[in-house]
Amino acid sequence: MRTSFVVGATLLGLACGGGKATRSGASDQTPQWLADGTGAIRGEGGKRLQGVGVASAVADPKARRRQADAAAREQLQTAVDALALALAKMSESTQPNLAPTTTGIARKAAGQVAAIRDHWVTPDGDERALAVVELDALRRALQAGDGDDRIRGEMAANVERAFDRVAER
């Protein structure tokens, strides 16, 4: 009877112990995206813009996650803005104040395809979030989006070159 209880308690403990979002703080388990940081990233799955956000000193896990997600989206926005600026510099358009136009078009297109991809919680309770825009998805969103057709088409055609310029920095 005592053995059955010990075995049952052990099995119950093992069954209930999984599924945590928290990972060890050991450097070999730190996600690669955390080391890559925010910006234009060339990865195994292709080219992408990513933002890494951090939430610290938030006791409530749901609030911490929302804060990390918001910070990641904000960081992603800086990467999208850098790409839009590179696209504006490459443009052949003679339209005055082209940078705000390209930034608006790029932000809208990126907003349609951006996604929070991952989270990582450190042993001390800080949470990191990863927001991503895949370059191919951004190109398709630029082609199908709103705004001046000629500028959108030019942006979609030059997005690869602009990405390469931003990634060099």
Segments predicted by a language model, with ranges:
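Sec-dependent bacterial lipoprotein signal peptides
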Residues: 1-15
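Domain-level marker for long, solvent-exposed, non-transmembrane regions
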Residues: 16-169
